[in-house]
Every structure is written in C-alpha cells, then in structure tokens.
Amino acid sequence: MRFNIVTLFPEYFDSPLACGLMGKARESGLVEVGFVNPRDHTTDRHRTVDDRPYGGGPGMVMMPGPLAAALRSIPRPGRILLMAPKGRPFTQELARELATGDNLTIICGRYEGIDARLESVFPIEPVSMGDFVLNGGETAAMAVMEATGRLVPGYMGHEESGEEESFSSGLLEYPHYTRPEIFEGHEVPEILRSGDHGRIAAWRREQALKTTLLNRPEILRDAQIDYNDLKILRKTDRERPGRNLYCALVHYPVVNKENKSVAVSLTNLDIHDIGRCSCTFGLGGYYITTPIEDQRRLLDGLLRHWTDGPGVSANPDRGTALRLVRGVSTVEEAIGDIEQRTGQRPTVIATSARGAGDTGFESVRRMLREKPVLLLFGTAHGLAPDVLERCDGILRPIRSLDGYNHLSVRTAAAIIVDRVLGDAL
C-alpha cells in the first residue's frame, strides 16, 4: 500500500516511519510512503504557500494553487483525505475501509486551514482525529497511516494479533498479563494459568465486555453482542446516573392556546407511560404537580390501586413503575423533596418546543455526575413563562431544526430521557 503525504514538513515523519513495525513494513515493501511539499509547486521566488484570509481575521490560509499543483503531481492518489476538525471521525471501521485500497493521499493542513475552494475541485474527504486542536495535520496523518497500514496483510506478522485488539470486534480489548506471576502482591488471574483455552476465551470475552461498559459505554451501541453478552453486562456493577435524574409533569402553571396561564387535569396515560419510562431508565423519581385537591385525591387513589390494592396482583410490573410517582402541589415542593432525599438542591431544567433552549442533552448528562437534575415537562401548550424564568436552564427542543415540533408529553419525555441517559448507561 502506498501513502502520499502532502505536507509542508516532510521531515516530521522521519523518526516514526523508521521505527518498529512501520519501519519493517517499509523495508519489506509492504508499505510505501511518498511526500509532496506544496512549496515545491509554487511559482514565486519566496515559495509562498499561504496568504491572509478574505474578510479579515487572525492567521493565514493555505493557498489553493500550490496545493492543487501538488495533488495533480501524484500519479495515483487513490482516496484523498484532509485532516480537519470538521471531518468524519477516524475509527477502526474507516481504517479497514482505507486498507482495502492500494493508494491513499493525506493532506496535512497548517495555519487556519486550506482555501475552501479546493474541496470543490478535488474529491477531498475531511477526516478528524477528535475534538481537539493540533498545530497541523502531520500528527493526525501519522496516526491514520499506522492504523491503516497495520491492517495490510503481513504487516503484523501474526494476523490474529490484529483480530483481538481493541475496536476490532467493536469492544475494547481484555487486560493482558505476563511474568512474573506475582507483582507487588497482585497475582495473574488463575484462569489464565489454567491452560483451559475454552475458559480463557470466555474470560477474555467477559473482561472485554466489562472494560468497554466501564470505560467507553457508548461503543456498545454498535458492538456485535449476543444474549449471553447482555447477561454479563447486566450483572456488571457500573455507574447509574439515571438515579440522579428526576422528572416532573407540571399541570400548573401551564399555558393554553391563547398563551394564558391555566391549570389542566391529570390524564391516566401521562401518569402510567411516563412512570414506566422513568422505571425503565432507573430514574430517581417522577413527580406529578397539581395544586387542585380533587386531582391530588384522584392521583392518590390511582397510585394506591396499583401499588397496594387489587392492581398489584393484576399487573405487578405497573405497580413497580408507579411506586416512583409522587404527587406534589408545586414544582418547589418537588425540588424540596429531592433536596431532602439527596442532600443537594437539584439543577432544574425545563423542556420546551419553543425557542432554541440553552442546554444540550450532553450537558445534562454531565450534570448528573455531580448532582441531581430535575426535568420539567409541561402539559397543555407548555410551561408558563414564570416557570421557565425560575429554571436553571431550558433544554434544546427535540426537533430543533424542523418546523413541526408537536409531540405528546409522553413521547417527548421518553425521547429526552433516552437522549440524556442512553442504553449503555
């Protein structure tokens, strides 16, 4: 496989390309690396490759002319990658894609980036190594070369080495041990010394699953796992941030079609469905807020039926879910109850289909690591303005880029809780 690196600093690669497996692969001819310097394709005596950006602003921009000439000088470029923050995340899956080709060209950006018009002239694919900033694309290009090159047949020597590495099966790798058998009081697990290859394989699979769940749970969403794997994962002790998440279904004050503040009646579906959602995701609690006494009595009777009355034997699962429900008169009462239960005042986040919001789903997920969060869901046509003003934040609408955004509160609650917590959490 041949890599063509378009860079202003070809000397950057001298040491890493000469070391270890990459050095051996180049010596054997499995991997070839060529460099094209845009400075060699300039037309002025100063060999200029950058200029000030149109519209002003800090920094310089790589000029399109030298880069275009550099790309056209490559006889067989193959796919052309541009290392850039805006690009497709580089993953093991993408490395496998790239390894199927014979040629790969990688553009290493510098300064503020390249002239955007270059992407209209050439079939350039932006690729990102992550959400951080480097001085240039050379470090990222080296990572792409190594991850892709080691998938070339013969590169690893023992092909099974690549098959059992992290991400190769969609999971992180299991832990490794070598001599001595005991190191500073810590022993190598007995099963690895047993010689029983079947048990060892099962242990390694279990450890890979647990390591992934505890360190990179988001990977599990796309990993190939079976029912036995799920049983292992369910038994694994892990953080449960859902315990720090609470929700409240607000029936007053909410607004009607005329945008007037009103109180609305409770509905069976809202109570049951959001209760089941809260139980499924392991929430700390679900509050029904209404100041109307007869509505509170109605709620209390319904809850008694399913948690202590005839409903327990008829549908015990529903009773389990509804034990999370607490009736309160106001949002402030719910806040006080959470503070009493947890020792911390919760961060209160409103939900609304209007406006842009000021809090993202990932932000709420991060909050849960530190303190409880109370999500407010409005009935009728949404929470009243005075409720929104007293909140610590307003969640971004579920379909913030589309015009139609009229979900039932039950549907909205399920979607929001799933986005905040996710299956793996």
Curated annotation (Swiss-Prot):
Database matches in SUPFAM superfamilies: alpha/beta knot
Signal sequence annotation: none
Any one Gene Ontology cellular component term annotated for this protein: cytosol
Location in the cell: Cytoplasm
Quaternary structure, from the entry: Homodimer.
Main localization of the protein described in the UniProt heading: cytoplasm
Official protein name in the record: tRNA (guanine-N(1)-)-methyltransferase
Keyword Isomerase: no
Gene Ontology annotations of biological process type: tRNA N1-guanine methylation
E.C. no: 2.1.1.228
Alphabetically ordered keywords of this record: Cytoplasm, Methyltransferase, S-adenosyl-L-methionine, Transferase, tRNA processing
Catalytic activity: guanosine(37) in tRNA + S-adenosyl-L-methionine = N(1)-methylguanosine(37) in tRNA + S-adenosyl-L-homocysteine + H(+)
Keyword S-adenosyl-L-methionine: yes
Residues annotated as binding S-adenosyl-L-methionine: 109, 129-134
Membership in a protein family: Belongs to the RNA methyltransferase TrmD family.
GO MF terms, alphabetically ordered: tRNA (guanine(37)-N1)-methyltransferase activity
Species: Oleidesulfovibrio alaskensis (strain ATCC BAA-1058 / DSM 17464 / G20)
Segments of this protein annotated with the region Unknown: 242-425
Region listing for tRNA (guanine-N(1)-)-methyltransferase, in residue ranges: 1-241
UniProt cross-references to InterPro entries, sorted A to Z: Alpha/beta_knot_MTases, RNA_MeTrfase_C_dom, tRNA_m1G_MeTrfase_C_sf, tRNA_m1G_MeTrfase_TrmD, tRNA_m1G_MTases_N, tRNA_MeTrfase_TRMD/TRM10
HAMAP family, per the entry: TrmD (MF_00605)
Function: Specifically methylates guanosine-37 in various tRNAs.
